[in-house]
């Protein structure tokens, strides 16, 4: 029986091909993964002339790119055991897991990927503060494929964003086009604008001089030919979605004078700019993403002070304002250029380096006795103001900045004639938030009639939280049970069963499943939405049991469906709904809890003050 692990004879087979100058490690990915090439035990040291190229397992655990975090799970994807002893891993109180994969241009199978994801999920649930170390021979293609698949399926990244995230943290990332093509074929087969692999790295071109050419299983390679590159020198390792798609319209074309940015260089620059302004280290749309309010998280309302606002049935855009130029970024990170919209400072100069979060709506207003459409931008949060980062300020301060530094300055400029209403492409207002006590009033007819557009829910915003990019579990969105919905990718197929008439079925897909999340009957109306993103609600019976999915509308502002976790959370709100009555009753309960907590806090402060004031008197009496 062959000896497991390295032996002198196995070490004499030589270093892995092209290993010597391959970068040792990447950096932390999503605060969870740490990619690296396979380390080698000390039996290989005599084959490495310069000590700086030696790479032992112990070096991984102490690497500065871990920023003090500990690796708790080590996943070895190589197809051999000759490189190091597993005890060199387990002696660091780390779980070692071997997942043999062929490599050499062969992507991980669906089963391999599912096993990897399950393993990481179970570990991360048990040890949320530990890191997962992953390596194949070089730590690029197999490693990148599996990490990107995990980010896509579990963390709900877009596929291009998942691949890009790995590229940013592992020296341009996956460099073999076959692996990228396989990712798209498996997870996003409808995407035409696929990412191109970066140019093959210099170290990959090198052949090991004086060493036998090896592959993972320790046998000599049958070919020493270096594959040709695709000629693409994509420095970022990914392409942002939306490039070249000129059919997309701002607000579905309801507002004239706004055009999509067709200059790809300018678009990429602007996308990188707002990503930097937000300190956002991922790909795609950098805005804060609220979560659905459910019976499972409604207790957050009693844990800290919240403000409440209505949820407008408009479209969300991040707006970048700089020196007279105004750009809008939708949830697909598409860039639009807005003309004839001015933002000024107190002295009338153009506002600089400002980034705000908005909803754009079409209000119904009465002008000279006739009802007219009034485009309006509602600013509800701010990340940058005049080059100053305000993301770490509490929400109530950011809310005040919107009024005093943006809305009031525009109002003053209109009064002095510096700005003219007739020259503005749309109206701009601050979207109001109210103390939590006002929740019930937002359901009242007086408020609903006052708002000139459709309301489709409420937003609950903590007063003292900073602005967070990406998913924020503290910011809650509530919709009436009848309005709760999931965004699906629709696939319409014709099914023919023997002895029966053909039937058209709509299959509803979310990002994280190769199997449909649900189905619905494909009517003639529905067929035209094949391969498009549609919004659906779930009809339930009077006992809360699911009946069927119902089509609501096409989501022209989105190019990807919801992720699995989001879809499951929304379904929970449909099956166990938070009704208007339940919400108002719970808000009143939360207010009572907060009031008691505030009273207890004041009582504690008074008590501490009395103790402090009594100390000098007690000392005098003792003397």
Curated annotation (Swiss-Prot):
GO terms for cellular component: nucleus. SUPFAM superfamilies: (Phosphotyrosine protein) phosphatases II, DNA ligase/mRNA capping enzyme, catalytic domain, Nucleic acid-binding proteins. Keywords: GTP-binding, Hydrolase, mRNA capping, mRNA processing, Multifunctional enzyme, Nucleotide-binding, Nucleotidyltransferase, Nucleus, Protein phosphatase, Transferase. Its main location: nucleus. The active site is at residues 136, 311. Residues 44-196 form the Tyrosine-protein phosphatase domain. GTP binds at residues 316, 331, 357-359, 477-479, 553-558. One of its GO terms (molecular function) is phosphoprotein phosphatase activity. It comes from the Eukaryota. The keyword Nucleotide-binding applies. Residues 213-229 have a biased composition (Polar residues). It is found in: Nucleus. Its EC number is 3.6.1.74, 2.7.7.50. Residues 610-623 have a biased composition (Basic and acidic residues). RNA triphosphatase activity is inhibited by magnesium. Residues 13-224 are annotated as: TPase. It catalyses: a 5'-end triphospho-ribonucleoside in mRNA + H2O = a 5'-end diphospho-ribonucleoside in mRNA + phosphate + H(+); a 5'-end diphospho-ribonucleoside in mRNA + GTP + H(+) = a 5'-end (5'-triphosphoguanosine)-ribonucleoside in mRNA + diphosphate. Residues 241-585 are annotated as: GTase. One of its GO terms (biological process) is polynucleotide 5' dephosphorylation. Residues 213-243, 603-623 are annotated as: Disordered. Residues 230-239 have a biased composition (Low complexity). Bifunctional mRNA-capping enzyme exhibiting RNA 5'-triphosphate monophosphatase activity in the N-terminal part and mRNA guanylyltransferase activity in the C-terminal part. Catalyzes the first two steps of cap formation: by removing the gamma-phosphate from the 5'-triphosphate end of nascent mRNA to yield a diphosphate end, and by transferring the GMP moiety of GTP to the 5'-diphosphate terminus via a covalent enzyme-GMP reaction intermediate. In the N-terminal section; belongs to the non-receptor class of the protein-tyrosine phosphatase family. This is mRNA-capping enzyme. It comes from Caenorhabditis elegans. The lineage of its organism: Eukaryota, Metazoa, Ecdysozoa, Nematoda, Chromadorea.
């Amino acid at each position: 029986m062959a000896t497991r692990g390295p032996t002198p004879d196995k070490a004499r087979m030589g270093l892995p091909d092209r290993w010597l100058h391959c970068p040792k490690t990447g950096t932390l990915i999503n605060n969870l993964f740490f990619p690296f090439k396979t380390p080698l035990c000390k039996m290989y040291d005599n084959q490495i002339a310069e000590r700086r190229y030696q790479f032992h397992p112990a070096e991984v655990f102490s690497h500065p790119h871990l920023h003090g975090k500990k690796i708790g799970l080590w996943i070895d994807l190589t197809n051999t055991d000759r490189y190091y002893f597993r005890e060199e891993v387990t002696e660091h109180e780390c779980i070692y897991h071997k997942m043999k994969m062929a490599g050499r241009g062969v992507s991980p199978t669906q089963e391999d990927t599912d096993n990897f994801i399950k393993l990481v999920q179970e570990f991360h649930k048990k040890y949320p503060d530990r890191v997962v170390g992953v390596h194949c021979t070089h730590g690029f293609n197999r490693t990148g494929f599996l990490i990107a698949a995990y980010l896509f399926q579990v963390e709900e990244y877009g596929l291009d964003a998942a691949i890009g995230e790995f590229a940013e943290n592992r020296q341009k990332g996956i460099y073999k086009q076959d692996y990228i093509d396989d990712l798209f074929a498996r997870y996003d087969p409808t995407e035409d604008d696929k990412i191109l692999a970066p140019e093959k790295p210099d170290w990959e071109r090198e052949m090991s001089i004086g060493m036998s050419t090896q592959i993972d299983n320790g046998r000599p390679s049958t070919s020493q030919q270096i594959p040709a590159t695709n000629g693409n020198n994509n420095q970022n390792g990914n392409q942002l979605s939306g490039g070249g798609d000129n059919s997309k319209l701002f607000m579905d074309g309801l507002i004239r004078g706004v055009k999509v940015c067709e200059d790809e260089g300018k678009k990429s620059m602007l996308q990188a700019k707002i990503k930097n302004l937000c300190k956002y280290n991922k790909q795609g749309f950098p805005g804060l993403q609220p979560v659905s309010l459910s019976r499972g998280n409604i207790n957050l309302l009693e844990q800290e002070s919240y403000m409440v606002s209505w949820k407008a049935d408009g479209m969300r855009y991040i707006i970048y304002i700089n020196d007279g130029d105004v750009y809008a970024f939708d949830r697909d990170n598409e860039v639009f250029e807005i003309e004839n919209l001015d933002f000024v400072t107190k002295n009338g100069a153009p506002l600089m380096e400002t980034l705000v979060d908005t909803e754009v709506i079409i209000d119904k207003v009465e002008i000279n006795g006739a009802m007219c459409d009034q485009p309006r931008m509602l600013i509800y949060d701010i990340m940058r103001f005049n080059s100053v980062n305000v993301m770490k300020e509490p929400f109530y301060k950011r809310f005040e900045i919107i009024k005093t530094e943006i809305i009031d300055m525009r109002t003053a400029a209109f009064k002095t004639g510096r700005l003219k209403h007739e020259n503005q492409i749309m109206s701009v207002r601050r979207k109001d938030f109210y103390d939590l006590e006002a929740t019930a009033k937002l359901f009242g007819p007086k408020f609903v009639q006052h708002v000139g557009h459709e309301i489709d829910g409420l937003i609950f915003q903590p007063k003292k939280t900073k602005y967070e990019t990406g998913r924020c579990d503290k910011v809650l969105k509530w919709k009436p049970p009848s309005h709760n919905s999931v965004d699906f990718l629709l696939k319409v197929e014709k099914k023919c069963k023997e002895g029966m008439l053909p039937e058209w079925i709509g299959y509803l897909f979310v990002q994280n499943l190769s199997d449909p999340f649900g189905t619905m009957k494909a009517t003639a109306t529905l067929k035209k939405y094949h391969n498009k993103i549609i919004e659906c609600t779930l009809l339930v019976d009077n006992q809360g049991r699911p009946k069927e999915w119902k089509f609501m509308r096409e989501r022209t502002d989105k190019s990807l469906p919801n992720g699995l976790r989001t879809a499951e959370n929304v379904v929970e709100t449909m099956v166990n709904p938070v009704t208007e009555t339940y919400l108002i009753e719970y808000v009143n309960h939360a207010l009572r809890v907060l009031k008691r907590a505030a009273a207890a806090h004041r009582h504690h402060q008074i008590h501490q003050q009395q103790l402090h004031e009594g100390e000098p008197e007690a000392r005098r009496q003792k003397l």
